[in-house]
């Protein structure tokens, strides 16, 4: 019973520390002005070792315990493990020297596995709220900007965290579709010419379809936003072993002191859902009338050609007469 209480106390203590932990931003690199989120974390592990790795315990520890941690979020170190180095197995013999090649490992009679302590340095990507990061833009829409950090981690900047004086320019999707359809209609006539001129490459319509996007954002100076973009971390989401970052392009002074978000209306703060056609109730009723027309059904007749007459159900009338007679 005391062990259960002790486990509950430890769990509550861990929750309290995690809840009230002070967020500390990572140091800023003076060369590029971004936060250095990659840190070295020395850890000690008590690991098991399979019998097949007794001759080479370092390889066994790496394959069994360290390699599965790489490029995954680890809650104990608070980030994504990028790699490790400096693996050392501690000798169970306290009298042995550190530079000895042979290490004493604990083995019990009930299992063929060995157990030992080891020290290793983990390189962890730990983004914190308030850090300044850079990412390459890979998607732009009216509701957000999607970025890729270090070609591995996703980041998103929502519309509410984009400056008000920025404007999103939509691509004319209908014109691109017309170009594709026109090119497909004329593809039979120009197929041989396109192959000769482009070396067997695809036609213009397919090229337009491959490069079609939702649009792009334009800043206050009218310059399109593309390539690498610098932002501030607003929130870090850890779902399972995957990490995603929410960023903002608005400084704290503009957001708090000047009431930045209050300048947006409630309609602008709502998420944007793009629809090609908005159907109203009147249009729905008209479409239903046109689609649901009366069907011309043939008359059902008996074998001799006479019309079928359905008699009314006389059970109710018989019940009424019987009740009156009673």
Swiss-Prot record:
Tell me the compartments it is located in.
Nucleus, Nucleolus
Locate the compositionally biased regions of type Low complexity.
182-202
Q: Where in this protein does the record put region Disordered? A: 179-202, 288-326
Sites bearing Phosphoserine, chain numbering? 244, 251, 265, 269, 285
The record's section on Pfam families has: RPA43_OB, SHS2_Rpb7-N
List, alphabetically, the InterPro entries matched. Answer: NA-bd_OB-fold (IPR012340), RNA_pol_Rpb7-like_N_sf (IPR036898), RNAP_I_Rpa43_N (IPR041901), RPA43_OB (IPR041178), Rpb7-like (IPR045113), Rpb7-like_N (IPR005576)
UniProt's post-translational modification comment states: Contains an average of four phosphates per molecule.
Which terms does the UniProt entry file under GO BP? Answer: nucleolar large rRNA transcription by RNA polymerase I; ribosome biogenesis; termination of RNA polymerase I transcription; transcription by RNA polymerase I; transcription elongation by RNA polymerase I; transcription initiation at RNA polymerase I promoter
Major subcellular location class: nucleus
Bias-annotated ranges (Basic and acidic residues) = 288-304
- Report keywords, A-Z: DNA-directed RNA polymerase, Nucleus, Phosphoprotein, Ribosome biogenesis, Transcription
* Leftover remarks: Present with 4070 molecules/cell in log phase SD medium.
* Subunit field text: Component of the RNA polymerase I (Pol I) complex consisting of 14 subunits: RPA135, RPA190, RPC40, RPA14, RPB5, RPO26, RPA43, RPB8, RPA12, RPB10, RPC19, RPC10, RPA49 and RPA34. The complex is composed of a horseshoe-shaped core containing ten subunits (RPA135, RPA190, RPB5, RPO26, RPB8, RPB10, RPC10, RPA12, RPC19 and RPC40) where RPA135 and RPA190 form the DNA-binding cleft. Outside of the core, RPA14 and RPA43 form the stalk that mediates interactions with transcription initiation factors and newly synthesized RNA. Interacts with RPO26/ABC23 and with the initiation factor RRN3.
State the similarity comment. Answer: Belongs to the eukaryotic RPA43 RNA polymerase subunit family.
Q: Would you tell me the protein name for this molecule?
A: DNA-directed RNA polymerase I subunit RPA43
Q: Which organism is it from?
A: Saccharomyces cerevisiae (strain ATCC 204508 / S288c) (Baker's yeast)
The encoding gene: RPA43
